Every structure is written in C-alpha cells, then in structure tokens.
C-alpha cells in the first residue's frame, strides 16, 4: 500500500468465510493500513467495501464511535480501539442499494454511525417467526 501516492482499495464481501470476531479484526486491520498509507504519503487513501454483513457494519460503527469517545478521553479510548483504527464520521460514506436499484444513504447524522436497518431486516423476520413459534409452544400471552 505504501508504494503509491495514494491507494484506492475495493473489497467485495470481506465477511465471506469469516466468523464475526474475524470480521471485526479484518476491518480494524484494513482501516489501520489505509490510515497508515494516508499518514505516510500525506495523500488521502480510501477503501470501498461491499457487504451484507451486520457484523461488518457494527465493526465500522465501533470505529466511528471511538472517534467521538476519543474527544472525551483519548487514553481510555485507545485501550478499547487502537488509535490508528479510529474513523472520523466525516471520512466515511455508507449506502444501501434499494429494491429500485438506487443508492440510499444509511449514515445516521444524529448518532454519527451507520444505520444499516435495511441489512438487518432478515433478523427481524427470524425474530418474528421465533416469537410465533414460542406462541405455539408456550401459548399466547394474554
């Protein structure tokens, strides 16, 4: 990554064949390398990641939240997230491709994190079915 003046890295579905903990470690590694390349060259580098994994979104949200926590207590923040893995909210973009094929911005300006509710819709469906099956097994709550 350090050979060029700046880097544009595209990664498709990094979650493939990785457990959730490994997904988070991979995102931290990628962000650390991109930040290091930017620092070393003085030129902005970037990464584009396509994903359908809520774990990847959550990993990015941890790094985004760390940027806010860093302003309150940097030393305590660095014990949780490495300094060179932190992402300022202004440095990230996140989009969802709608059923109509258009891009929808899923950044939540208020909490300064990635929304991603669209990605986790499958979890809602599973939870609804589990709830219905619990009703069958244990009777409906009255």
Residues of each region from the PLM?
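Switch/communication elements of ASCE P-loop NTPase nucleotide-binding domains
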Residues: 1-124, 139
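Aromatic (Trp/Tyr) and acidic
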Residues: 127
């Amino acid at each position: 990554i350090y050979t060029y003046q700046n880097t544009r890295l595209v990664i498709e579905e990094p979650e493939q064949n990785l457990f959730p903990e490994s997904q988070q470690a991979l995102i931290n590694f990628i962000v650390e390398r991109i930040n290091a390349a930017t620092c070393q060259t003085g030129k902005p580098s970037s990464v584009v990641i396509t994903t359908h994994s809520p774990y990847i979104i959550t990993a990015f949200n941890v790094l985004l939240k760390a940027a806010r926590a860093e302003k309150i207590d940097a030393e305590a923040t660095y014990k949780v997230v490495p300094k060179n893995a932190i992402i300022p909210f202004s440095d990230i973009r996140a989009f969802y491709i709608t059923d109509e094929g258009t891009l929808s911005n899923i950044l939540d300006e208020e909490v300064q994190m990635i929304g991603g509710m669209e990605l986790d819709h499958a979890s809602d469906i599973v939870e609804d079915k589990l709830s219905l099956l619990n009703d069958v097994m244990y009777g409906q709550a009255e």
